[in-house]
Amino acid sequence: MYIDDYKRWLSADLEDPALTDELRKIEGLDNEIKERFAVALKFGTAGLRGILGAGSNRMNIYVVRQATQGLANWVKTQGGSQLVAISYDSRINSDVFARNAACVLAANGIRVRIYDALMPVPALSFATRYYKANAGIMITASHNPAKYNGYKAYGPDGCQMTDDAAAVVYAEIQKTDILTGAEMMSFEDGIARGLIEYVGEDCKEALYSAIEACAVRPGICKTAGLKLVYSPLNGSGLVPVTRVLHDIGIDDITIVPEQQYPDGNFPLSLIHISEPTRPEPIS
């Protein structure tokens, strides 16, 4: 069975040439083929997570499209705003996966609010609630090594999708052919039709205001003379974190230059992870 799936992918006119190259390189290597095609990534309350690459057991545009079609089928039964919020982090192909998800949703007549630049998970949760969306999608693999990416789904409350909702989405995913089953529209067409819009400045400002309103002693940082060293760990925190720090009065900030800007390879860590609770990325 998995050999048949492999041959189908190999003979298909895939949009991503890197996937075709990978499939050609593993031709005749049964273990490599089996690892990619014997099972599929399973969608659960935490969404999907897997190694980047070709096949149903890898993260690629076809797995993302299939998952999004399953999510779209569920959203269409929910009434409400018929809108989904999307964000993404600095991982490899995160922006590509986010745009593909937006294109599937738009093709299903579902409106999309997508960030125009990478933003972290809390920003996605906030946008989901701000726009009263039916769901949110975050392209991220959290603390996993650089070779991973993932697809997290959130409910209208901005929290992780419930077991019941995730089960329905998973059932819809299983009904969707991975290569041809997802509805698609170009990103540009989605913009032109008003189905895809970027998250507005009003939402971003509301996010920062909500964070700053949580201060236990407002104003104390302005006179505390604090000096901070901050590392975004090559992730998505640089813009929102420094914005909030400046807003609350902390201006003496030293940013670790090697980890300042987004880089999905997490190059400064010898094991290529961005997990702040482990010593390797910050040593």
Question: What name fits each language-model region?
Answer:
Residues 1-4:
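Polybasic, low-complexity association/targeting segments
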Residues 6-101, 108, 196-224, 236:
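An N-terminal, well-structured beta->alpha segment
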Residues 49, 91, 152, 277-278:
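Short, cationic motifs built from Arg/Lys/His that form the positively charged side of catalytic pockets
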